[in-house]
Structure formats: C-alpha cells, structure tokens
Amino acid sequence: MNPSPLLDLIDSPQDLRRLDKKQLPRLAGELRTFLLESVGQTGGHFASNLGAVELTVALHYVYNTPEDKLVWDVGHQSYPHKILTGRKNQMHTMRQYGGLAGFPKRCESEYDAFGVGHSSTSIGAALGMAAADKQLGSDRRSVAIIGDGAMTAGQAFEALNCAGDMDVDLLVVLNDNEMSISPNVGALPKYLASNVVRDMHGLLSTVKAQTGKVLDKIPGAMEFAQKVEHKIKTLAEEAEHAKQSLSLFENFGFRYTGPVDGHNVENLVDVLEDLRGRKGPQLLHVITKKGNGYKLAENDPVKYHAVANLPKESAAQMPSEKEPKPAAKPTYTQVFGKWLCDRAAADSRLVAITPAMREGSGLVEFEQRFPDRYFDVGIAEQHAVTFAGGLACEGMKPVVAIYSTFLQRAYDQLVHDIALQNLPVLFAVDRAGIVGADGPTHAGLYDLSFLRCIPNMIVAAPSDENECRLLLSTCYQADAPAAVRYPRGTGTGVPVSDGMETVEIGKGIIRREGEKTAFIAFGSMVAPALAVAGKLNATVADMRFVKPIDEELIVRLARSHDRIVTLEENAEQGGAGSAVLEVLAKHGICKPVLLLGVADTVTGHGDPKKLLDDLGLSAEAVERRVRAWLSDRDAAN
C-alpha cells in the first residue's frame, strides 16, 4: 500500500493548492513520515522541522508562492518547505556534498526567497521585499516566519520597530515553541509563556483532544463546540487586551492575531486566508511543539534538535534511545569545556557567557557546576560581547564561548566595547575553518582576517588538543582581549595535560627541521603540513599565534630557506599568510612565497574532507600544489 498517496501528487505548491482543505491533515501526516525517513538517512535539523509541518503546508496552500515570498528565519525548519517545492526526490542528498543545502538558498530554488543560516534576519528581509513591492506597485505578499528563540535577538526588534512605522503589507508569523536550540531565556519568552490567551489555548486543545471523538458522533455537536471555542477565545483575547491595554506587538504597530494552534492545519488555512487580505503590518502568533509527532524529540527537543542519522530499519517507528559511543579522541569543544571547568574551580572570578549555544559550545557541565557564573544571554551576540566588557570592567574574567561565524555578528562590539578599552575578555572561538554539512553560512573562514587588524587583540590558533588547552590558559592570563580559535570535531589524538601550563605569547615553535622549503603553518593546518613535509624534507613551524606574530621566527626561516609556504584554514585575503608577507616586507626580505588558504570564493557544504580537498587544503592537495609550484619555479629558472 502506498504510504504517501497525496504527497506523491505534489511536485510544487501549485499541486498542493489543488487539494481539498480537508485533505491537508492527511498530507501533513504523510509529510511528517517522509521527513522522518529522509532525515533518518541523511541527518540534519530534526525537531524544529517536525514542529513546522502543518504551518508550512498552510502557508504554501494560502500564499501564491513563489510570487508571494516566504522568508524563513535561520532555516532550521525549512525541510518541509523544500519537500513541497519540487525537491522531494532530492531530500536524500540534504547537507551532502553536491546535494541540497541544509538551509534556504536563493540559487537552489526560486521558492527560497532569501538565503539564511543565521538567526533573526527574516523580518528585516521580508520588510525590504514588501517595501520594494510597494515601490513597484506590486500586490505580492511577503511573510516572515520566525521562532520565539530568534525573536529574542535585537535585529528582530529593530525590524519590528521599522515595520510598525511603515505602510506596507507584511505578515510576521511567530512560531512559538518555547525553544531555540536550547530552552529560551530572557523576558520575552516569559511574556509569551504567561500570556492568558496561551493558557486558554492549552486548555481548549486538551478539551478538544478528549472530547472530539465523542462530539463527532453527535449530529451538530462539533459545529456548536467550534462556535463555543471561538467565543471563548474571543473573550479571552478581549480580557487579555483589557488587562494589558495593547499587546507588545500592537505597541510596535502590528495587528496581533492569536495565539492559534500550529498543528491544526485547516484552521491555520482559515486564519491565513483572512490575514492575506488585510492591509498593513500583521503578526500571527502560532503555538507549535518542537518535535511534534515524534515522542523522543517531543520529550527531549534539545537532544533531537539536530541528528547525525536515525537507524534505517526503524526511522519511521522512531529509533531506540541508544547513546552513541564516545569518540576515542576528545573534540576541541570537549577540551575547552573541561579546561573551563578546571579553570573556574581555581578562579572564582571566571564567568562564562554564551549566546544560546550551551550544548554546541561545550558549556553543559559548566552550567551544572557553576550556575551562578553561567550566563546564557539568548541569541544576542552583540549584547554578549558588551555584557562581557561590563563584567571585565568590574574585575571579573569573562570567557565568551562563541562560534566563529556568530562572532561576525558582534564585530562593532568587539572593537568598540572590548578592544579599544583593552578589556581582558577571552573569546573561545569554536567552529573555526570548514564546518561541513551546514555550509557557508556556518563556516568560520574570516576570523583571522577580521581579528588580527584590531588593536590590542591577541589571536591564537592551536594545532592540536593539548596546544588548545595551553593557549586557552595562556590567553586567559593575558591582561588584554584575546581569541583562541579552534576547529570543529576531534583533534590529532595527542595526550592532553590536566594542568594550567602556559606558553610565551607571540612565539611559535619548530615542529620539524628540513631544508630549502619552510612551511609556516597555523592551527589546523599544522597536521597536513607535517604530513607533506616528510615527503619534501621541509621545515615546519607551528606559529601558535597570528597576533602578535613571531617575527623573529619568520625572519630566521626566510633567511635560512629558499622558499616559504604559508598554510591556514582561513580566507587568504587579510589572513595569517598576509601577516607573514607583511613581516617579510617590513624586513626587506624577498623570497618566493606560496600562500595556501581559502581563496576568494563561497564554500560549499558536505563532507569536510572533500571540501578541504576542493579548496586545496587537504594533505594530498597541499602536496599536489606545493609540488606543482616547485616544478613551475624550477622550469622558470
């Protein structure tokens, strides 16, 4: 028997709109099953997609996509959207090398109105589209779909503030599941959770679930119950508005509707059809459950936010709750998490800050052991950095655990609030370099370039796990702002010290002595440099620091070797290799230099090893490039 007769009919939203509204609940069920199977094979963001199935169906059913624009915030919940927009048969390639991207991507489909991967951009982008349509005299509609976690970021409120004062037709759908990746923090989630109407919504949902089957058997009873439900909701809304005068969003100039059940697809269609005909800024508050329809994800949405894969034989039935085997080698994130706890036990001034990335940044144990010194500020990177600056002013020792790609969002604060005042804040910059399946929006390829130009900054790049701990300890003790950047995943497997040893700031070390060719390597590129150097009898320097850079070592290597190769997992432009060239120019040294890094291009997604090979940064690719360079130079001479 065909498990998805309705879904099989749909290759575009136009096919979806041919269905009767009463068929949509069945379609949503088929879509959820298909989602379980596809993510079960490829891995990816999981719980958030299960919670957005009915909402996605309703939006594409009501809005005339792709002419009408749906702008998904972050993009974690975009898989149902991709399935309904002609990519169903490619879902097995999701986040794989050469396959579908894990986030909306304009070059992938005309239905992906705005490329995304970071949080809280949807309202601003959709507002820009709505303003453009007004200028062009178009009656197209723009819709921003944003979660309550993403709504905590300042950029979302900046866009709300702007939109409420503009005469444009914009719908903001607030998908409220009380989660980002971790449970939400801050005043806004408390406001949403305490809403009287939300409480009434929960009560009505319970009553409907328990009485619906009985009412179905009584002629006319269901229709009467729906009228009563509508009246109760209306009274509750009126009571809430009387209590609060105007809701938060109405004070921003939006007409507020909701909250409504985000898993009742037929009712969602009715509500959206009404909203599509309204003028001006509108906000629809939708209540959903992250992981809906999948008990393990419902019960633990943090664990099932993203999964590597599900057992193939049981994906549709839900996998057994079996803990994965621990990696033989610790990840850099784990090395940081252990160092942080060890350091905090020895220094009561240490405080840790994360912008809503507790699990990913390795802070779970720290929060459990030192809850009073743990600050999750929500999806608010700008605030996280300035907040750290305030702590440092009063004698605390802040450690900001942040991904490289998200540190970009707080660049002004890094310069203005930290570096110009020379405040001793340590940035533990995770996910530096290629990250793999999440693609270019999450790659950490620019931090060396944008950090090393900032006055007072110390920038370190460890080559292995033990060096990571060494450099964290070293930079923590520095009386200046410092960043230690390290990659995703496991290291090289070297033993890791339990101590708090330090090294001299701004000094590198020689890892291998050779002749003629000197490899000047930074961070994760030390390992491939060593692998290649043995075949070419080259010298390898592990620089450790990008700023201050070891000028003495660079000059010595340049004068004792015929040529230099620099290696970094960062953009070539303005990166560590550029720093080496600056040193050579400063000292009037003219030697052939091959600069190996990430060229001026947007990287792809998929297996990191394949991506590094494409970029010419795997050990094999480095050897090919160096040999070709040497051959060209020999031929030229």
Curated annotation (Swiss-Prot):
Biochemical pathway: Metabolic intermediate biosynthesis; 1-deoxy-D-xylulose 5-phosphate biosynthesis; 1-deoxy-D-xylulose 5-phosphate from D-glyceraldehyde 3-phosphate and pyruvate: step 1/1
A single GO cellular-component term on record: cytosol
Cofactor binding comment, as recorded: Binds 1 Mg(2+) ion per subunit. Binds 1 thiamine pyrophosphate per subunit.
GO biological process: 1-deoxy-D-xylulose 5-phosphate biosynthetic process; isopentenyl diphosphate biosynthetic process, methylerythritol 4-phosphate pathway; terpenoid biosynthetic process; thiamine biosynthetic process
Residues where Mg(2+) binds: D148, N177
Catalytic reaction(s) noted: D-glyceraldehyde 3-phosphate + pyruvate + H(+) = 1-deoxy-D-xylulose 5-phosphate + CO2
GO MF, one annotated term: thiamine pyrophosphate binding
Keywords assigned: Isoprene biosynthesis, Magnesium, Metal-binding, Thiamine biosynthesis, Thiamine pyrophosphate, Transferase
Cofactor(s) required, per the database record: Mg(2+); thiamine diphosphate
E.C. number: 2.2.1.7
Keyword check for Magnesium: yes
Gene3D superfamilies referenced in this protein's UniProt entry, alphabetically: 3.40.50.920, 3.40.50.970
Residues reported in the UniProt entry to bind thiamine diphosphate: H76, G117, H118, S119, G149, A150, N177, Y294, E381
InterPro entries: Dxylulose-5-P_synthase (IPR005477), THDP-binding (IPR029061), Transketo_C/PFOR_II (IPR009014), Transketolase-like_Pyr-bd (IPR005475), Transketolase_BS (IPR020826), Transketolase_C (IPR033248), Transketolase_CS (IPR049557)
The UniProt record lists the keyword Metal-binding: yes
Domain of life: Bacteria
The protein's role, per its UniProt record: Catalyzes the acyloin condensation reaction between C atoms 2 and 3 of pyruvate and glyceraldehyde 3-phosphate to yield 1-deoxy-D-xylulose-5-phosphate (DXP).
Family annotation (HAMAP family): DXP_synth
Record's subunit section: Homodimer.
PANTHER family linked: 1-D-DEOXYXYLULOSE 5-PHOSPHATE SYNTHASE-RELATED, 1-DEOXY-D-XYLULOSE-5-PHOSPHATE SYNTHASE, CHLOROPLASTIC
Family: Belongs to the transketolase family. DXPS subfamily.
Name used for this protein in its record: 1-deoxy-D-xylulose-5-phosphate synthase
Species name: Neisseria meningitidis serogroup A / serotype 4A (strain DSM 15465 / Z2491)
